[in-house]
């Protein structure tokens, strides 16, 4: 099947927001108005098209980013619905990596919320151009202008209004289009499918003129000719203004702001027009960087069908009907069923079996995919999230994704031998699907340990194990992922000697072991000159050091942020071996950790509590009792917002405590911020418990 749309007519975009801002509802309306969905699904009755996992429909939150394709105004939209809950940040990060643009949905009542800040930062990291949709304008307390201010205050964005609301709360009727200077009004009885232009209401004419001037001034600033004409009193026409706004969005100079109520079917079609008019195509985003597989030099791939095939796998899912499916973005070249590709990340060959175009939860078989497409592949053997699939003759490794370390863990014990077998298969599939979910075995107890980004993250994984994979298991209480490090420099000189008749073992190593910069992890370097330790034994030295990192000397937690320099050593012509140096390095490193003033580190969470004013005192008192440090508080609407840094160890079960003393009226979000040294009195308790 030949290409149906030119690559410049593609819009690969995601919808990102805080939980409950109305992201999935907005996507549902987009699918409805573009003709992909014959009935509108509502999140609150568990029928939304994009939320297709049972866990999502029950909880009313989006967990996995489902990709779907739709057509609007002759353009092909590939939409990725991303989760807004902080425990699923990894999903957002993955989808932003493969998007060209994004729509940031705000709750008209709440404005910029904690997860909005997180997603905005992630979009900055990947340089994703974005437009803003202020949703829920029909809600009590909705305030469009406050939301616009919050974009500046909270995320240092540069919002420029392209629309203004007509009315708010129950009287929200439509929007003023500042580009065309018309009022757009929706007809309630037609499920939002019908709307018409009117003249701008007289009471809003001055405000519309004021914001129109701001829009035009922001737009013409980016173009010398338009600026000159504007200063001469010539305003840009509609087509020119649109092209200037597009230029500003693609260059990330400002963020156009639109408004509506997806639930009340108002504002969605102009938002779709804005996606088409202002968000970039793959051509606008330009070449993607990569590393040449053979030479390891930097290279690029242009978004063109004529380039060598270069594809990035950004999500793996286990589908009950098709098996494992891999969501991919074709960055360059074209891909056909039956084609042989190289997984350059793992240096393994793969063959493209079945290729699917996904629409939320139904799928369409296709034979070819072209540059710019987002498709799902079934039947790949060994592909993980972030892997590159490419033409073996011109292999490339595209930029890798970065995944956060888990901060919370639970032990899981299958109830029977049959469960044990099912658990192994299920966990390997879940870990392949989600790189922020890790599985390990506790060496001492033999228990299987699940690690994740938060309580909800692990709750849902356990739920999937029980429902989808029918694994019956006992689940332990959540544990904190502590770390260990050292606080002072130590020089260690260690000799390993063993003589048992025949060839013995001999190795001497001398290290300088010192604290590394926070977050830099473990670093090993060899400063050996003159062959005191022969080159062939250096890998043995490194292996010995790395074998200690998994279990520190205080309570057996992983060791982080330590720098080790090999400065001297000695070897024996006959008795030395890589194994001898491995043993010597292991013992030397453990000694250095013990003598380097070791400390425990714990994850500190950034906590935001939104509470009615009556409960603010209780919230602050409770957070203080949890070793929290209050960072500040401000008002959001008529609610008080308390920001604090609190150790994760003290946040278990917080949701129930908060619910009980606020009668369910206060809410909170938390996300990992950094690791910090555990106070000595608490450290003693932790060591007593784990050592």
From Swiss-Prot:
Q: Which residues form the tr-type G domain?
A: 8-283
SUPFAM superfamilies, per this entry?
EF-G C-terminal domain-like, P-loop containing nucleoside triphosphate hydrolases, Ribosomal protein S5 domain 2-like, Translation proteins
Matching CDD domains: EF-G (cd01886), EFG_III (cd16262), EFG_mtEFG1_IV (cd01434), EFG_mtEFG_C (cd03713), EFG_mtEFG_II (cd04088)
Mention one GO molecular function.
Answer: guanosine tetraphosphate binding
Compartments where located: Cytoplasm
For biological process, the GO terms are: ribosome disassembly
Q: Which Pfam families match?
A: EFG_C (PF00679), EFG_III (PF14492), EFG_IV (PF03764), GTP_EFTU (PF00009), GTP_EFTU_D2 (PF03144)
Q: Where does GTP bind?
A: 17-24, 81-85, 135-138
Q: Which GO terms describe its cellular component?
A: cytoplasm
Q: Which family does it belong to?
A: Belongs to the TRAFAC class translation factor GTPase superfamily. Classic translation factor GTPase family. EF-G/EF-2 subfamily.
Functional note: Catalyzes the GTP-dependent ribosomal translocation step during translation elongation. During this step, the ribosome changes from the pre-translocational (PRE) to the post-translocational (POST) state as the newly formed A-site-bound peptidyl-tRNA and P-site-bound deacylated tRNA move to the P and E sites, respectively. Catalyzes the coordinated movement of the two tRNA molecules, the mRNA and conformational changes in the ribosome.
Q: Which PANTHER family match?
A: RIBOSOME-RELEASING FACTOR 2, MITOCHONDRIAL, TRANSLATION ELONGATION FACTOR G-RELATED
What is the recorded name of this protein? Elongation factor G
Q: Which organism is it from?
A: Xanthobacter autotrophicus (strain ATCC BAA-1158 / Py2)
